[in-house]
């Protein structure tokens, strides 16, 4: 664990201070695929013959190229083996994972505090819950009910097992929230048809590192939004994290090829210069952890689509901006140190750095050379920062 007074996270990556010409990048997206109505602020369906077919029931689903991709995603995550804490700590990207986990912890805690100002009982939908990596966050947030939904059946089974373990390890007087587990492709199936209580309403929907998969098509993106938002109470929140399309396109355009990355991650597009609003596919890999196709989320379109479900964007920050804002709060800074979300530099005598690659810690080395700076520092390697800084945080609120 890092020293209590360590200086936190000095960044010196080529992307940390780069200016993004968002107007020029936005104009690169192909708007011919869709139009928005000024009267309804909703996105009309134009693709795959969906103009007149609003029936999302399983009986209406066809086996298409899109659905085959969803099956690939489910199969991929079903094959990922569960590993213990000791094994995860050997990962090259352990500090980046911890950093992302800290960021989610801060986001979830702040939103639950807002909700609890209005309601004593809190119900949450974890949309794309995976293996249940946020279960302890919900327990710490003292919620009352959690619904977990994911496309991968094996992930849902592991999530349920984790939940049972949390309950079993808890103190007899320590009440744990009730939970419901649903296996579903949330970009194609309506959760309201699968809930034990079809009238259940949520105070929060959390969608972490998931929503971009739904931007394969307009109908999928819309169904995912519907699942996230239609059962939210007025004043409820839809929160999440997703890749920043502006940042991805900027780095791609700066690259000499159709790909970019470093020793921990890579992103590969089929070509440059054309970025359709839906189905803009790229291949993403992260230290062997994830290697499935993903899709750009053009955020202005995301915001416009959300209006259909009476949602208003109230917060949007890149991970860099979120960190710089939230670490100013002492309790968040303490949490970051407790979660070991930054790597100690220089390491102690028995430790070693996560990477021996050239230039990975030059930014920390320069900072540590300043006599006015207290050592040790807390940092991420250059490669980890470049990987995590492609993401952003968003919060939508349900209007009355």
Curated annotation (Swiss-Prot):
Its main location: nucleus. It catalyses: a 5'-end (5'-triphosphoguanosine)-ribonucleoside in mRNA + S-adenosyl-L-methionine = a 5'-end (N(7)-methyl 5'-triphosphoguanosine)-ribonucleoside in mRNA + S-adenosyl-L-homocysteine. Residues 20-68, 347-370 are annotated as: Disordered. It is found in: Nucleus. It is an enzyme of class 2 (transferase). The keyword Translocase does not apply. This is mRNA cap guanine-N(7) methyltransferase. It comes from Danio rerio.
């Amino acid at each position: 664990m890092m020293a209590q007074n360590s200086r936190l996270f000095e960044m010196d990556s080529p992307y940390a201070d780069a200016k993004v010409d968002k107007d020029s990048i936005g104009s690169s997206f192909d708007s011919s695929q869709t139009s928005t109505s000024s009267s309804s602020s909703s996105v009309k369906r134009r693709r795959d013959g969906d103009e007149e077919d609003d029936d999302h029931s399983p009986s209406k689903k066809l086996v298409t190229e899109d659905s085959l991709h969803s099956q690939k995603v489910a199969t991929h995550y079903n094959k990922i083996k569960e590993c213990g804490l000791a094994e995860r700590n050997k990962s090259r990207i352990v500090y980046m994972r911890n950093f992302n986990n800290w960021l989610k912890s801060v986001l979830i805690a702040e939103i639950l505090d807002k909700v609890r100002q209005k309601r004593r009982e809190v119900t949450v939908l974890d949309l794309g819950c995976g293996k249940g990596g946020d279960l302890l966050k919900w327990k710490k947030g003292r919620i009352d009910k959690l619904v977990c939904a994911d496309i991968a059946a094996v992930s849902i089974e592991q999530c349920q097992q984790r939940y049972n373990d949390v309950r079993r390890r808890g103190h007899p007087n320590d009440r744990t929230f009730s939970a419901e587990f649903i296996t579903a492709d949330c970009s194609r199936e309506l959760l309201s048809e699968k809930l034990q209580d079809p009238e259940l309403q949520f105070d929060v929907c959390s969608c972490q590192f998931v929503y971009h998969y739904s931007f394969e098509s307009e109908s999928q993106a819309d169904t995912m939004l519907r699942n996230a938002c239609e059962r939210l109470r007025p004043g409820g929140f839809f929160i999440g994290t997703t890749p920043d399309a502006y940042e991805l396109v900027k780095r791609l355009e700066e690259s000499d090829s159709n790909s970019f990355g470093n020793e921990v991650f890579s992103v590969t597009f089929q070509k440059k210069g054309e970025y359709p609003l839906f189905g803009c596919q790229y291949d993403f890999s992260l230290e062997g952890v994830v290697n499935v196709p993903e899709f750009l989320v053009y955020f202005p379109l995301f915001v416009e689509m959300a209006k259909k479900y009476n949602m208003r964007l109230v917060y949007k920050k890149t991970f860099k901006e979120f960190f710089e804002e939230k670490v100013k709060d002492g309790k968040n800074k303490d949490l970051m140190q407790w979660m070991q979300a930054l790597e100690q530099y220089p390491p102690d005598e028995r430790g070693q750095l996560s990477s021996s690659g050239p230039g990975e810690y030059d930014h920390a080395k320069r900072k540590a050379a300043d006599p006015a700076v207290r050592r040790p520092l807390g940092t991420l390697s250059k490669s980890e920062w470049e990987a995590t800084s492609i993401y952003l945080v968003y919060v939508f609120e349900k209007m009355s």
